[in-house]
Amino acid sequence: MIQFLDQVDRLLSNPPRSRGEARASQARLGAAFKVLAEETLGFTAAQLDLLPSQAFSDVSEEFVRRARAFDPGLSGEDIYQAGRNAWTANGLQWLLGLPVQNTPSVFAYSLLYPYTDNYLDDPAIPVATKAAFNERFRQRLAGEGLAPADAQEQVIFDLVAMIEEQYSRTDYPAVFESLLEIHQAQARSLKLIRRAAAPGEVDVLGLSFEKGGTSVLADGYLVSGSLTEAQRSYTYGHGIFAQLLDDLEDIGQDSREGRLTIYTQAAGHGSLDSLANRTFLFGRNILSGLDCFDVAEPVRELIRRGADLLLIDTIGRTDQDYSAAFLRELEDHSPFRFSFLKEQRNDFLRRHGSLVKLMETTLLFQASRDVRDPY
């Protein structure tokens, strides 16, 4: 861990000044992470060698350049948010045996997130305003011809047009049905932006599942055009699990900003031990469906192990919501003491700020006009 963090610290303290330096830095960082993964996280060299690491690195770099070219006003955090969805789509491409690449649909759908998701999640914007925007967006997704109301809508409609250029509405109706499903889920999820609700007043679990599931289901259709029933079931479940992880990590922020999740509802009424255990079991059940993809069992095991570690780390970072006994038991399954991870994380934040800066340093600089070195 220390070796890996040292490489991260060097990268952030001395940002690369050319593409050649960046690639060398990325190679050193990758080598340090491989040592960390093998010696501490419990992965084998054979498992890691099965991952298309270089392809993911290249496609991430390209995504950032294209996003900057599409809208120079996008912030690093916006691109990071969009990139997270693109990485999910790229992962599905790999699982489906497709080339790992930024297709027009993957690029467009991923960029829709900073333009729409943040807008709809903003508690300062009146619900009526969001509803009006949502209806116009729905009409455009449904293929209705209408002129954009403002510059923001123009950008959003242009992104929808990118998807239409790749997929014919006639030949690939499921693609656009999936987009309407995630749009409907986003609209319905506005009911979650409230500080409290009487029992049964808001279907928090159902709305959360729908929002997460439809998001990754759309990724699946956008990367392949069609899915088997088993693949559809897995991608929907994957999206739910990812949503639960996000909600578990954001308990404090969601509580402060008045967003209902199954975790904020339970927080303050006792420990979340039981709810966290159910989240573990749910994730393992979903990931058992990985056999719908033609990938080697060591890869499936790597994904399952990675999901467990991610959930353990998330709980360790929000330890105030759990009992001491539960945390001690969970820590036995962590490669690091929670106190050590917290110390390292706090030190990183003091020195460098958020993890978004790491992405900006390793990727965003390559889109800068100041970088002249083609090598």
Identify the function of each model-found stretch.
Residues 145-174, 272-317:
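Primarily interfacial, aromatic-capped hydrophobic alpha-helices that serve as membrane anchors
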Residues 3, 7, 24, 28, ...:
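Exposed alpha-helical structural elements
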Residues 112, 150-163, 201-209, 256-267, ...:
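Short, surface-exposed, charge-dense and proline/glycine-enriched linear segments
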Residues 211-214, 239, 302-311, 322-332, ...:
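Alpha-helical transmembrane segments of multi-pass membrane proteins
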Residues 43, 317-318:
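Amphipathic alpha-helical coiled-coil segments
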Residues 50, 57-105, 109-112, 118-119, ...:
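All-alpha helical catalytic cores of prenyl diphosphate-utilizing isoprenoid enzymes
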Residues 41, 52, 63, 276-279:
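Hydrophobic face of amphipathic alpha-helices
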Residues 1-55, 91-142, 220-234, 238, ...:
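Acidic, metal/ion-handling microdomains and their immediate structural contexts
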